[in-house]
Amino acid sequence: FLFSDEPEETIDEIEHGTWKVLIVDDEPEVHAVTKLALSDFEFQNKRLEFISAYSGAEAKELIKEHPDAAIVLLDVVMETDDAGLQVAKFIREEAKNNHIRIILRTGQPGQAPERQVIINYDINDYKSKTELTAQKLFTVIMSSLRSYRDIISIEQSREGLEKIIIASRDIFSAHSIEHFIEG
């Protein structure tokens, strides 16, 4: 059955694509260190593609341009004390993107209390920059990509089931009309 005109991803695209990781931080060194620490990272035959934003405003634009980003590593304090939180709010409420995994990184943990932030902003993880070693960064990226992959898989399955239900309804409706006409 052909249910949609949308092109299907080929096996080659799935196996050889990249995982988009948006790095949002006003410190260029954080971008450089993150890219270096994850330079050889690979998950399911895909490498990471880094997209850098240095402000909340720039991050919002990049979220619009890359709705398929898997992860955002998000600093809290940039041009304002809550710029990162505003980006998180934008991602979930305005962009309506519940797929992307948001990892909040802060150099000032007291600025945004972890418990409140996780609850109020639909953040997936919260890390202090000082505790985020290369190994911990690897771990959080790996677990976030697994979550993202599973969310996308569930969403695709749900969409497939919706198409089957619609097609079944159409087939049943056509069969019922034929049966009615035949008397």
What are these regions (language model features)?
Residues 42-57, 62:
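Short hydrophobic/Thr-rich beta-strand motif most characteristic of the beta2 strand and flanking loop
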Residues 120, 136-149:
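Receiver (REC) domain switch/output surface
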Residues 1-22, 29-49, 68:
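Non-catalytic signal-transmission and effector/linker regions of two-component phosphorelay proteins
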Residues 39-40, 58-62, 77, 82-101, ...:
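Short amphipathic alpha-helix used as the core "switch/output" element in two-component signaling
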Residues 66-78:
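Active-site beta3 strand of CheY-like receiver
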Residues 23, 150-173, 177:
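Signal-transmission linkers at sensory-effector interfaces
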Residues 24-25, 53, 59, 72:
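Conserved sequence signature across two-component system core domains
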Residues 103-106, 129:
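Hydrophobic/aromatic residues positioned on beta-strands within the core alpha/beta folds
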